[in-house]
Each structure stands twice: as C-alpha cells, then as structure tokens.
C-alpha cells in the first residue's frame, strides 16, 4: 500500500483496531459494500480476547442500565444466525453453543448478594430471564459440586464460543467481502482535512471518508484527536488452563469454562493493574482454590498454563458508542463485551456508522444519553 499524496479518500471507512470489536464492525461494513480498511497492531496489541473465557453472556449485565440488558439479550438472540452465517461464508466453525450458563455461589452471603442483583435486574428488565437455583436444583445439573456451593444464578440464553475461531472467522469474512487489512501498524495521528481523514501509521499514510476508533485501550490516546472522549481504562484478567479432561462440564460458568478441546479455563478476576500484563501467583492461587471448592474433583487435575491480559472497561462498565460533532465522520466504540455483542456490532453498529440506520439502541450508549441510565 503506497502513501497517498491527495486528500481524496481511498476508503469509505478506516477501522482502527483488529480485535473482536473492530473486526466485527469492519466485517459488517465490508459486507454492506463499503470500501473498508482495518488497521491492526497485530500480535503486539493488548488483545482483550486473551483475557476472557469466550462466553456469550446475559446474566448479571445491565444493573442500573436496562438499555444494556436489552442490548445484551438482543445480541444473545442473534448469535445462532450470526454463527451460522460466519460458518457458511468462511468455513470456520466458531463452535457457538447455547447451553445456558451459571454463576456459582459459595456460602449464604454470596447467594443472597447474587439473588438481590438478579432480582434487581429482572425488575428493571424482565426479558433478562435469569433465575436463582438453590443447591438442590443445582445438584440436578452438577451432582459433583462441593459442600460450600449454596446455589447459582442461571440464564438459558447464556452460552459459549471459541473466541479465537470467532476472531479468525471475522477477519477471513472481512477479507472475503473485499476488505483491506493492514497489520502490524499502529496509528499515531489522525487529522481531518476537507472531507477526509488522514491516518498516519508508521510509514503508511491512508485516507478515509470515515474513521472508527475500535482500538481498545488505545482509544484513550486517539479519541481526543477527533474530538471524542476516550473514556476507557485497562482491567487485567487472569486465566488458568487445565489439562484436557475426559469429564464434560456441559454448562459453562463465569469462572469455569471447558473448551471444545477439553481443557478447563478458570478465571473471572478484574484487577486495576495499569498496563501490567504479568500474572500474580496470589490471584491465581485464589482462582484455583475457588475452582476446587466448587468441584472438589478438580484438586487432582493438573494445570498446564496461565496468562494475563488487559481488557477494556468504560467508566460505567456499559458499552460506549460515540459520534464526533467537531469531526463529522469520526466514531469510537468501546466495550468489554466484544464476544457477546459481536452479532450486533457486525450489523446494527455497522449500519449506524455507515449512516444507513439510526437505531435507538445504539443512541442509548452515546455519552449524551448516559444521564438517563
């Protein structure tokens, strides 16, 4: 790709960021027939997807923000068709399964606290469909739970997917829709000149009519250049991986998810650690102890890997979708739910950025609307 010497935009939209959020929107934009460029730092980027357990998750989301609950429910309902579409186009099966999902509670205090949260969300948003299961009901699903387990919350819309295969399918689908991919480039500056945005990424300069910031933590650095508020901070997640298990954990939980390969992913921590991606033995030990308390049989299981990754968190934990008033054509998107919301990012959000549909659901997550939540 050669540097441009003209302000004539070579692309309809340039998407900065090639993680799950950026790739989903870019896939959708290219599918709409827009000439789309995805600029991606590549493996040096802080990939948020490395720090999650690949859940498509409804329960517990949107407390105090019914719009987020409704958005999440809508995404979960869209997942079966979305997964089938990606598979048909790319041949990549992301292994999406709607299994229902659990959040285990250890002790009465955890159960009562979770019960209050679920009741509050259900009062605000009955469509969320979460419920509490006492210990006896939970034993019908998992007879092997430990004596400390007092119950769990459950939602039938929850499920799981292989997020790495999802990422691969989105990138492959994007390029099959004639999208252009520029890897191993970090955007340093953005300027609006006339009817176009100039993006300088290393030794490359590209021009686009519109630009979407979907760069995760880097949005905080880039947003001010186009009159937007970064509004994000890094949150560290840590993951433990077990050896492949013969036994099957058919219903995933927030902190215990079995992959399609058989290994068990353990982890559901959120830490404010700046840009530190190192693991912490104290935290990992706590995660392992909780897993054994939940399923005592795991005590003899060998752990084979651990890692940490930085996830993206907005100021209030809800998605943030922005459209610049001072730089028309500039947009930004941030969320820590890139897996769950992928179907809507590829459709509704892409159409919003393309100017084809002003969906009220998207407008609800603009900064100007925060006060109504």
Can you say where each PLM-predicted feature lies in the sequence?
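Dinucleotide-binding Rossmann-like beta1-alpha1 core, especially the glycine-rich loop
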Residues: 54-137, 141, 290-292
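Glycine-rich FAD pyrophosphate-binding loop
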Residues: 31-50
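Helix-loop-beta segment of a Rossmann-like dinucleotide-binding subdomain
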Residues: 92-105, 129-177, 269-273, 328-335
